[in-house]
């Protein structure tokens, strides 16, 4: 008689859901107050003028205007500002 033994289980086959991080509004784009500009882990980008920081380091617009990316300071940090 043809028999097949039970197959062993695999230990792989899992993956976490993607977190959809990254820049949501790019330089020169118009934003409204409250719009999310960047979702990030840690402060890859720092908040500049008219930009707020959320509990999870999300950067968001505090006023209406255009997004501006700039590199400043001795450590070449990336700042995001809103030009009204």
UniProtKB/Swiss-Prot annotation:
GO cellular component labels: cytosolic large ribosomal subunit
Keyword Repressor: no
The organism's place on the tree of life at top rank: Bacteria
One of the Pfam families matching this protein, by short name: Ribosomal_L27
Gene Ontology biological process terms, A to Z: translation
Gene Ontology molecular function, alphabetical: structural constituent of ribosome
Coiled-coil parts of chain: none
This protein's name: Large ribosomal subunit protein bL27
Species, as recorded: Shewanella sp. (strain MR-4)
